[in-house]
Every structure is written in structure tokens, then in C-alpha cells.
């Protein structure tokens, strides 16, 4: 009998990426949080109608909240409730995880940012990261490194 391999997080499982977060911050630690969602939000996530670009995580009174995430309702959403695309959504974390994030985020220059939204066993999960803001020269250095990697790939492609 052959061993069953564990399913890894593949691009098919990813709903939305916050590419801006990795450019503007040094990510020091990542963790996964559940989301308290309404039915119409889950349907919109399945359709891929979500934007994490301006989203951030706020920890207040022992609870973690996702603020600024836009989930656009489907045109066929429920008629008896009025969907709010930018409502504040509660993140589902253990108390120890919230305490660790609170202590770390209180330090100067640190924040908690959403990295990506993905499916795990049929549930929507949010990867969040403890991050420290980059300086302008760090961003420039990263941009130069990306350009150099791209040029190397082009050169190797044309040599072969």
C-alpha cells in the first residue's frame, strides 16, 4: 500500500494574495487564523471576489479583527440582508496566539498584516504575519534584486 502524501497549499487553494505586504514589510513570523464569515461572503470567496490590498489586523480587547478587507457580494446575494463589503471581520485565534501577537505588535515599528486568504479542508483561512516596516532603501534593494533575477532568467533562456 502506498503512502498518501499530505496536500500542500497549492495555488488552487489560494483565494487572494496581499503582494503589497511582502514588498512593504519584513515578515518575521506567520500564523494561520480562521474567519467568522456570513453565508454570502463564503459564496463571494468561492467566486474570488476579495481584495486584501488595504486590509490590516487590529487586536482590541483580546480579540483580533480584520479591517479593510473588501469582499464584493455576488449579484445573486440574499435579498433579505444588506451585504456590507468592507465590514470588520473577527479572526478566530487561540488566546495564546492573540497574547503573543499583542505583545509583539506593541513593540515599536511592528504590526500584524494579512498575507493571503486560502482554503484549508473546506474552510477559509487567513495567513497573517508579524511584520516590521521596510525603509525606502530596503524596498529599492529588493526591487533591484528582483530585476537582476529576471534578467538572469532571460539570459539563461536565450543561451539554451
UniProtKB/Swiss-Prot annotation:
UniProt cross-references to PROSITE patterns, sorted A to Z: SSRP
Ranges of Basic and acidic residues composition bias in the record: 139-150
Keywords of the record: Cytoplasm, RNA-binding
CDD domains for the chain: SmpB (cd09294)
Name this polypeptide is given: SsrA-binding protein
InterPro entries: SmpB, SsrA-bd_prot, SsrA-bd_prot_CS
Region annotation (Disordered) ranges: 130-160
GO molecular function, one term: RNA binding
Compartment annotation: Cytoplasm
Family to which the UniProt record says this protein belongs: Belongs to the SmpB family.
Encoding gene, per UniProt annotation: smpB
Domain of life: Bacteria
Coarse class of the protein's main subcellular location: cytoplasm
Job of this protein: Required for rescue of stalled ribosomes mediated by trans-translation. Binds to transfer-messenger RNA (tmRNA), required for stable association of tmRNA with ribosomes. tmRNA and SmpB together mimic tRNA shape, replacing the anticodon stem-loop with SmpB. tmRNA is encoded by the ssrA gene; the 2 termini fold to resemble tRNA(Ala) and it encodes a 'tag peptide', a short internal open reading frame. During trans-translation Ala-aminoacylated tmRNA acts like a tRNA, entering the A-site of stalled ribosomes, displacing the stalled mRNA.
Family matches, as Pfam families: SmpB
Any one GO CC term of the record: cytosol
Amino acid at each position: 500500500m502506498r503512502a498518501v502524501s499530505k496536500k500542500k497549499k497549492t495555488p488552487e487553494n489560494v483565494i487572494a494574495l496581499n503582494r503589497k505586504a511582502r514588498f512593504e514589510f519584513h515578515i518575521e513570523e506567520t500564523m494561520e487564523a480562521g474567519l467568522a464569515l456570513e453565508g454570502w461572503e463564503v459564496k463571494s470567496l468561492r467566486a474570488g471576489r476579495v481584495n486584501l490590498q488595504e486590509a490590516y489586523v487590529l487586536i482590541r480587547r483580546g480579540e483580533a479583527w480584520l479591517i479593510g478587507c473588501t469582499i464584493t457580494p455576488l449579484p445573486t446575494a440574499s435579498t433579505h440582508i444588506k451585504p456590507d463589503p468592507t465590514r470588520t471581520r473577527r479572526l478566530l485565534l487561540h488566546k495564546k496566539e492573540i497574547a503573543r501577537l499583542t505583545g509583539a505588535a506593541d513593540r515599536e515599528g511592528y504590526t500584524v498584516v494579512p498575507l493571503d486568504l486560502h482554503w484549508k479542508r473546506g474552510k477559509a483561512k487567513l495567513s497573517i504575519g508579524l511584520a516590521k516596516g521596510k525603509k525606502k532603501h530596503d524596498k529599492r534593494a529588493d526591487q533591484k534584486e528582483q530585476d537582476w533575477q529576471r534578467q538572469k532568467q532571460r539570459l539563461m533562456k536565450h543561451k539554451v
